[in-house]
Swiss-Prot record:
Pathway annotation: Porphyrin-containing compound metabolism; chlorophyll biosynthesis (light-independent)
SUPFAM superfamilies: Helical backbone' metal receptor
PANTHER family (UniProt xref): LIGHT-INDEPENDENT PROTOCHLOROPHYLLIDE REDUCTASE SUBUNIT B
Pfam families attached to this UniProt entry: Oxidored_nitro (PF00148), PCP_red (PF08369)
Source organism: Prochlorococcus marinus (strain AS9601)
Positions with biased composition (Basic and acidic residues): 461-470
Positions contributing to substrate binding: 425-426
Binding-site residues for [4Fe-4S] cluster, renumbered to this chain: 36
Coiled-coil ranges per UniProt: none
Subunit structure: Protochlorophyllide reductase is composed of three subunits; ChlL, ChlN and ChlB. Forms a heterotetramer of two ChlB and two ChlN subunits.
Molecular function GO labels: 4 iron, 4 sulfur cluster binding; ATP binding; metal ion binding; oxidoreductase activity, acting on iron-sulfur proteins as donors; oxidoreductase activity, acting on the CH-CH group of donors, iron-sulfur protein as acceptor
Role according to the record: Component of the dark-operative protochlorophyllide reductase (DPOR) that uses Mg-ATP and reduced ferredoxin to reduce ring D of protochlorophyllide (Pchlide) to form chlorophyllide a (Chlide). This reaction is light-independent. The NB-protein (ChlN-ChlB) is the catalytic component of the complex.
Protein known as: Light-independent protochlorophyllide reductase subunit B
Top enzyme class: oxidoreductase
Length: 523
């Protein structure tokens, strides 16, 4: 067991709650102690939903452990069914209740209800939230469609031609507490509609059990979030022959690849690449004169597998950044992240320990961090601009406005979200350089956070460190003055490299000339 004050993913029953809360006419009975009801806050506070999740807790207490907790489970299941009248019932247990081994799913199936009951056996001590969401969606899909497996023929992607209608697809994977899922679905539906393709079902977000049974009315599946939907897509392919897409449409290049992949599977004519590129402003902005200073900016990326991989591709191929760190907390996506990192000549960081991520971030000395809510905190401590690209997220990352990550509009949003922190960083540096002019005063409002950046504190802390420099090296007045002209977000790396150079050359005092020589040496 590991004690920590932050975790990237909750236990698997939180993933099950995400699926239940995303859908209609479904109820989830969770065998759990009173303390596990905290998960409600994730949906009412973070997602800002107007209703509680469709979850009934057995909420057993310490005194109940001396009696028959199985009867408590049956009582809560009966009351939930009578009150909420769901079309499908999910039954599971939290990490604490797993130790009691009451087997609530088996109890529910023995109560004689006339509805599908999905028994969720989620190993709380070896799996995490995304796996729990994936397994829940998979078990739900399997339960509701298993009777149609033997009687159904394999579905051809070209069936729409035989039926004389427009092709239909399912969009699978979006859920509550996913990153911008609501807006991504709207954007992808719009793109598909422009291509003459209809959306059959979106699941689990907004779907009902009846919609799950209609999945086989479509020709192919769009696997929008592999962490949630890939297992279900594989099962549908294995049992019904339904093909599914592998390209995630985040960024211009991936969106074009996604459209072409869908067209190939449905035997539709391929579209003109240049015509598609003009649908977003990102390609032109990233090629414009104003964006030249972005080229080569060092970026550190950490998040869920889907968004981290997509961010790395956009950063490298579409914005001209240098990716100096790439990682994920999603062990299910570790192989794909490692492959992407290898292509970028960096070592992948696979961990759920935020301190390891912060340490790697510090060593990489990036000029921009793309990560989760925790990386935003870490970057703020290190004085590095940051943009959130992945869950876990704060309520401020669930905007009321339309703000997708996928498709053409998603590319526009990404450009704004990633580039603006860098622009603000440049502005901060200019103010730092000219702070002695009468127009500027210390304590001005910083764009890097809600508190001002006191440049004197930064310089003073640097001076204190200089007293303890490696091998007794001393910074002269000219050296310190020149160091202050270096942008604050790379000042630490420049200082470290200059000291390394001085040690290598046996230089006891670092002047402005030494700093210039070190820069030439490392470049």
């Amino acid at each position: 067991m590991e004690l920590t004050l932050w975790t990237y993913e909750g236990p698997p029953h939180v993933g099950a709650m995400r699926i239940a809360s995303s859908m209609k006419d479904i109820h989830y009975v969770l065998h759990a102690p009173q303390g596990d009801t905290y998960a409600d806050l994730l949906f009412t506070m973070i997602e800002r939903r107007g209703q509680r999740p469709p979850v009934t807790y057995t909420t057993f207490q310490a005194r109940d452990l001396g009696g028959d907790t199985a009867e408590l489970v049956k009582k809560n299941i009966k009351e939930a069914v009578e009150r909420f009248k769901p079309k499908t019932l999910l039954v599971g247990e939290s990490c604490t209740a797993e130790l009691i081994q009451d087997q609530p799913g088996a109890l529910a199936k023995g109560m004689g209800f006339d509805m599908p009951i999905v028994n969720l056996e989620l190993p709380a001590y070896s799996k995490k939230e995304n796996w729990g969401a994936s397994e829940t969606f998979y078990q739900l899909t399997r339960t509701l469609l298993k009777e149609k497996v033997s009687s159904s023929e394999k579905i051809s992607p070209l069936r729409w031609k035989e039926l004389g209608r427009r092709p239909k697809v399912n969009i699978l994977g979006p859920s509550l507490l996913g990153f911008r899922c609501r807006d991504d679905v709207i954007e992808i539906q719009r793109i598909l509609s422009e291509q003459g393709i209809d959306t059959n079902v979106v699941a689990p977000l907004g779907a009902s059990p009846d919609d799950i049974e209609r999945l086989i009315d479509a020709e192919i599946n769009i696997c929008l979030y592999p962490e949630i939907a890939e297992a279900s897509c594989e099962w549908l392919k294995r049992n019904f022959g339904m093909e599914y897409t592998n390209t995630i449409p985040i960024g211009i290049k991936n969106t074009i690849e996604f459209i072409n992949e869908v067209h190939k599977k449905l035997d539709l004519p391929l579209t003109n690449k240049e015509e598609l590129e003009n649908k977003s402003k990102l390609p032109w902005y990233s090629k414009s004169v104003d964006s030249n200073y972005l080229t080569g900016k060092r970026v550190f990326i950490f998040g869920d597998g889907t968004h981290a991989i997509a961010a790395a591709k956009i950063a490298k191929e579409e914005l001209g950044f240098e990716v100096v760190g790439l990682g994920t907390y999603s062990r299910e996506m570790a192989r794909q992240v490692r492959a992407t990192a290898k292509d970028l000549n960096v070592e992948a960081l696979i961990t759920n320990n935020y301190l390891e991520v912060e340490d790697a971030m510090k060593k990489a000395a990036p000029e921009l961090v793309l990560g989760t809510q925790m990386e935003r905190h870490s970057a703020k401590r290190l004085g590095i601009p940051c943009s959130v690209i992945s869950t876990p997220m704060h309520v401020q990352d669930v905007p009321a406005r339309y703000s997708p990550q996928m498709g053409w509009e998603g590319a526009n949003v990404i450009f704004d979200d990633w580039v603006h922190p860098l622009m603000m960083g440049l502005e901060e540096h200019l103010i730092d350089m000219f702070k002695h002019d009468f127009e500027f005063v210390d304590g001005h409002q910083s764009h890097l956070g809600h508190t001002a950046t006191n440049t004197n504190n930064i310089l003073n802390s640097d001076e204190k460190k200089e007293k303890n420099s490696k091998e007794g090296i001393i910074w002269t007045e000219s050296g310190r003055a020149e160091l202050t002209k270096v942008p604050f977000f790379v000042r630490g790396k420049v200082k470290t490299n200059t000291e390394k150079y001085a040690i290598l050359r046996g230089i006891p005092e670092i002047s402005d000339e030494t700093l210039y020589d070190a820069k030439a040496y490392f470049n």
